[in-house]
From Swiss-Prot:
Belongs to the class-II aminoacyl-tRNA synthetase family. HisZ subfamily. Pfam families: tRNA-synt_His. This function is generally fulfilled by the C-terminal part of HisG, which is missing in some bacteria such as this one. It comes from Prochlorococcus marinus (strain SARG / CCMP1375 / SS120). GO terms for cellular component: cytoplasm. Pathway: Amino-acid biosynthesis; L-histidine biosynthesis; L-histidine from 5-phospho-alpha-D-ribose 1-diphosphate: step 1/9. This is ATP phosphoribosyltransferase regulatory subunit.
């Protein structure tokens, strides 16, 4: 029999499970304070939904054997967009929804074999707000959540922001024969391949300039204006950064604008962002999101355009951070109940029920102890806080 879990997955010990629960619980409390309501999308969906109109590769979906083409969700955004446009279509907008659950991704390893990765995700979706107010609320909520999780400047958090319309502007004027190739070079920050392009020298020089532009939002926007001229989008982004930069500085988060940033899943058609934290080994993306109007409209039967935006946290990656404080602010005292050979096991059970009725945690040592000293040794060995000795 195999003694290891499937490649790409791991067994979680009780401390890891508890930490996942506490992170998820804290996030859900934050979402609800902001007026978001919980929904629970299914783990199993039709492949047509899971691929999110081509935004998610078919290869990344774990497929199930059934009469209908179905699979396990690699992300929850498409499922919520579907529910918002169908079962929740009658509800007043804006819809503020949050969810938490397991996602499954199929991934090709270095040997060309497909493995399944399982993860825990928690996030929010804001449906029905078409202007930049939606992104501002979501970014404020993202930063507030990060602060409440006590992710501090020690993790060097960076909020990386891009916009699909900036990339479209950069690619405008380029023939369709080259567009996909150039987009790949830009999103991969490939200066060498870009320099070797056989295209108009003026366009190439603009592309090379853009590849070197990222960092402080105000500086990046100034440089983009110098290259492409004034643009309503640039004005809207200036307003957004003017609002969110004070709160980001307060929480120790650095904001970077990257004109060529593209997320892995191609779900988004507007603002896109991800929150990155530094670990001992490498940077980790702990949250990502953006606007996905096209996705939510693909599910609607209404003649009116629908809009949507949201983000999600990776609970597993947050758990792996070396946080400033542990999530034990509501730690319950652990009590061990031990009894001598002159007492009955039932006596210990009665005492356990009495402690439980007070809302506290208590466990019974199933075998009698010879002495109280032996019971005290078990308390220390097993990490209990106190002993109830019945003799």
């Amino acid at each position: 029999m195999p003694i290891q879990p499937a490649f790409g997955n791991k067994d979680l010990n009780p401390q890891e499970v508890r930490k996942n629960q506490l992170i998820s619980s804290r996030l859900s409390s934050i979402y609800e304070r902001w007026g978001y309501e919980e929904v629970s999308p299914p783990k199993v969906e039709r492949l047509e939904t899971l691929t999110a109109c081509g935004g998610i590769s078919n290869k990344e979906i774990v497929k199930l054997v059934a009469d209908d083409p179905i699979g396990l969700r690699p992300d929850m955004t498409a499922s919520i967009a579907r529910a918002a446009s169908t079962r929740l279509a009658y509800k007043d907008r804006p819809l503020r929804l949050w969810t938490s659950g397991t996602i499954f991704k199929s991934k090709e390893d270095c040997d060309g074999k497909f493995v399944i990765e399982e993860g825990l995700q928690s996030g929010v979706e804001l449906i029905g707000i078409s202007d930049m107010a939606a992104e501002i609320e979501l970014l404020y909520l993202l930063l507030d959540s990060m602060n409440q999780l006590e992710i501090c400047s020690n993790q060097n958090p960076i909020l990386l922001i891009g916009h699909q319309s900036i990339l479209k502007l950069i690619l405008s004027g380029i023939s369709n024969d080259y567009k996909n190739k150039i987009q790949k070079y830009l999103t991969n920050y490939d200066l060498v391949e870009t320099e070797d392009l056989d295209i108009d020298i003026e366009i190439k020089n603009k592309l090379l300039k853009v590849l070197k532009i990222r960092g402080n939002p105000s500086d990046v926007l100034d440089k983009l204006v110098n290259i492409y001229g004034s643009n309503t989008l640039f004005d809207e982004l200036r307003r957004l950064f003017l609002i969110i930069e004070p709160i980001s500085k307060k929480y120790g988060v650095s904001i970077q604008l990257d004109p060529t940033y593209q997320p892995h899943f191609k779900l988004y058609n507007g603002l896109i962002f991800q929150l990155i934290c530094q670990t001992d080994y490498a940077p980790k993306v702990i949250a990502r999101g953006g606007r996905y109007d096209d996705l939510v409209n693909s599910f609607t039967t209404s003649i009116e355009n629908e809009t949507g935006a949201g983000f999600s946290f990776s609970i597993d990656k947050i758990r792996e951070l070396k946080l400033k404080v542990e999530y034990d602010d509501k730690k319950v005292a652990r009590t061990l109940i031990a009894f001598s050979k002159s007492k009955r096991y039932e006596d210990a059970l009665e005492k356990q029920l009495e402690i439980h009725r007070k809302g506290s945690m208590a466990m019974v040592e199933l075998k009698p102890c010879d002495t109280k000293k032996e019971a005290e040794f078990l308390v220390n060995k097993r990490g209990f806080d106190k002993l109830v000795w019945i003799s």
